[in-house]
Amino acid sequence: LPKEKYGYDWIIGNEKAFAANTRFVEQDLNRSAPGDINSSVYEVRRAAELIEYGKNFDVVIDLHGTKTDSGIVTIIPYPTEENIRLAKSAGLNRNVVWYSEKSKIAGPLAQHMPVPAIEFECGPKDTKKAFDLTYSAVRRFIEANRSGQEVCDDKNVEFYNVYGKLYGEHNPALRDFVLAEKGGESFYPFLSNEYSGIVCYKMEKTKNDKMFI
């Protein structure tokens, strides 16, 4: 889609890490916002640059990949009414609210953007399936945004809230968004077996109108 015609832009968030084929150079970019343009740490400076660049747009979508077979979902790091509305308009059925008070100091780029912002998380990364899902979702969103429409209506949308994590050895039997039970507790797994020492993040299904901050 021509950038000028559709009024959007795309950029690589962590350019140095991308060039080196690694997640980060000094620290996780998505744990570095709002950043500091005078920092000696590359990702902290880059976070500040990206936050400033975000002022040029009406909304920001931050694209991420995961090893898990989660399909494509939205993540809302900062669940304001505007960001929830943006997620509901994006055309994806599954939406994950993942907010932390600690992230006010240093956290996700989308949480600190000066305009409505969410993440698209898609997996398994580096697969044709993930590429096709991401491409289709982004294209639909850009086309709908240009015409002032929403991609889908509210009745097709599910919301989940991340409330904790399960530590331990990886469990291949767990599937994201498939109800599981551990120690008498029922929860929906997310990013199962993604990180060392963490089995998964735990979610509850919720109503989106109960989540505004």
Which residues fall in each region the model found?
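Structured catalytic-domain cores with a bias toward divalent-metal coordination
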Residues: L1-I213
